[in-house]
């Protein structure tokens, strides 16, 4: 289905109208051979910066994974205090981390242009995750259908971001945002994503405890559908399966299960099979499209995202040495995840504070591969950023 979002100010010749910009090397971190790949942290407006990156054959069409957490069109300033980080601060004494002041069609066009460039940078087997909120997400979904094709829409992931808030409003409380997952083509990298149960989940799913202290639950020994002529439709120990159902196992298997102590008999003589938690958890649990990765309690940057969540995305949609791009790098969580999982990376942001925080986080890692800080702003590096180098 062909879709298009129509709004005022929509540019029909995006690629032709975006200027490129020179990237000047500011500082190298770590040492390696000159002709080896260096990860890139770039200060500047991501639009002309990405246009410049398109001129490099080792980047254009080579990015395996894009994750972006763009501004949400909140019409607010996000600030950082000296002793704390605030998601939204009204104090003029705090340093501005970034401004999220674009709204309406202006915001949509801002994001659309960047999505078009990101598609150009993506490899044919690459994919993109766009993290957005519930207010703008549905408009962005239509934009992405237009750019990437509705046939390449993979998932709308719900992310539980916080605990329920106890305040009154005319409507339901909001504890989630969304991640739109698209591929560039049908042939995209997918390694699957699996999860393990928490202790609380196991206690809820396996509420019973046997004499040896093992947690278990029970399930019916019969299944839907009658089997009148087969062995699973016959009486076992004088008991017929309920009407319209059959035994899950033939009588000889039921006898074996009972000898092994894997059948629990109720006071009324109803048999049920025991399922033990310690055996069940050995199975891989396929991750679904509702995630609970809450924001860090003490973020180093406003809107900082959960590192475990980014690792899930990086592991599922890229392989070692693949190139990962985040053009709204923020606190650098995508880059940290890529670095720790052995991927190459490019991070771009126009906030001096974002670059500062990302640098500190990267250099705090026990091991970090060589990377280069570039200035792609077209202006001298801000003094606040010069002071931390």
Question: Which residues are covered by each model-predicted region?
Answer:
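Class I S-adenosyl-L-methionine
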Residues: 2-323, 355
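Active-site catalytic pocket residues across diverse enzymes, especially alpha/beta-hydrolases
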Residues: 57, 148, 342, 362, ...
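Class I SAM-dependent methyltransferase "Motif I" SAM/SAH-binding loop
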Residues: 328-332
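Conserved SAM-binding loop of SAM-dependent methyltransferases across substrates and taxa
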Residues: 333-343
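Conserved SAM-binding motif I beta-strand of class I
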Residues: 345-349
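PRPP-dependent phosphoribosyltransferase catalytic core
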Residues: 353-389
